[in-house]
Amino acid sequence: MRDRFAVSMLAAAASLAALLLMVMPGSAQDKQKGKGKEGPRIVRPKPNSPPAPRMPDGHVDLGNGKGSWNAYVIKDITGHGWGDQAIENVGNRGPQLVEKVVEPDMLPWAQKFVLDVDANMSKDDPESKCLPPGLPREDATPFPFQIYQLPDRLMFLYEGGAHMWRIVYTDGRQHSKDATDYPTYLGESIGHWEGDSMVVDSIGFNDKSWLDAAGHPHTEKLHVIQKYTRTSLDNLHIDVTIDDPGAYKKPWNTSWNIAWMPGITPLEYICQEGNLDLKHMVGK
């Protein structure tokens, strides 16, 4: 397992380096020439958007460095939450963020955990300590991220969440036999196309993250299935199924929409530099 892990990390580093060589020099040159102006970094999904672009192989183009995706603000992926993420009539502002209210059937300890998080104002949120958000929360934070499509994998580059990157293998492999032996924040992800949707199956998580900012917990038994569908030029629909018998009595499903930000690139974000007074984050 250790040899496989080392090879996997080297492959990830090589893939990331190749992507950066393809993308970053041009971006840096543009900024030096005064051409690096970016648009707004917080946007909402738009109505009446043009069709999604496609790659030469016919698959939907999920971005590939031409811009970034941004979830605006999603606190609670069950639909109970703040403002725009709540289930309400959003008029002509485009697709709703969280699309429906769901009531996960939680085990008693998980239900108590969520109530305690609410009571103490999320003072123990792992992300507040600059730890990775995990999944599916990584796709619901207010930080831009990009998706790159390579012949045998997808690469997710995140601005937030400790500047994480994520690899989704699309070369037809199955989950490794020891995927759950060495759990991680983002687990092991295997993807395949179903029509215009990229379906990503992930296992092998540790239990050190929350599913969302509302504090929905999970265990190392977590199994996440995400379906990414670029429904138009400006909208990415994310459908998520949570299956964790250690925290929930049965699988549950949620979904949300996030907006396309053309020309936006993830910036350097060092969480620790602004995280100087944790001892006073005491909640109630």
PLM region descriptions:
Residues 1-8:
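N-terminal secretory signal peptides that target proteins for export/translocation
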Residues 11-22:
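Bacterial N-terminal signal peptides
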Residues 23-284:
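PEST-like low-complexity, intrinsically disordered acidic/proline/serine-rich tracts
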